[in-house]
Amino acid sequence: MQSQKIRIRLKAFDHRLIDASTQEIVDTAKRTGAQVRGPIPLPTRKERYTVLISPHVNKDARDQYEIRTHKRVLDIVEPTEKTVDALMKLDLAAGVEVQISLG
């Protein structure tokens, strides 16, 4: 496994949650002897929604809502068998989406 690279992409709505999960992954990988690049913050996606709060006319009465999707990328350059086993057993927070790819 010395020539492979593991890329981990994380997505979450709460930046504190994604930062804690990223730090937990980095600590686990470094503890098992792997080299880590990142975390690299990717652009935050902001989705805005405008809702009319008036039941009939009055177009000036509106509420605006926004949801932000925070993203991070980690590269584990030299994964060992211990690194892969430790990452598989790692229990992350419920609000974080994890996507793992080998390359």
Swiss-Prot record:
SMART domains reported for this sequence: Ribosomal_S10
UniProt keyword list: Ribonucleoprotein, Ribosomal protein
A Pfam match: Ribosomal_S10
Matches recorded under InterPro entries: Ribosomal_uS10, Ribosomal_uS10_CS, Ribosomal_uS10_dom, Ribosomal_uS10_dom_sf
Residue spans crossing the bilayer: none
Recorded GO MF terms: structural constituent of ribosome; tRNA binding
Keyword Hydrolase (UniProt): no
Key word Ribosomal protein present: yes
A Gene Ontology cellular-component term: ribonucleoprotein complex
GO biological process: translation
NCBIfam families: PRK00596.1 (NF001861), rpsJ_bact (TIGR01049)
Subunit-structure text: Part of the 30S ribosomal subunit.
Functional description taken from the UniProt entry: Involved in the binding of tRNA to the ribosomes.
HAMAP family found in the cross-reference section: Ribosomal_uS10
Family (UniProt): Belongs to the universal ribosomal protein uS10 family.
The protein, known as: Small ribosomal subunit protein uS10
Organism: Marinomonas sp. (strain MWYL1)
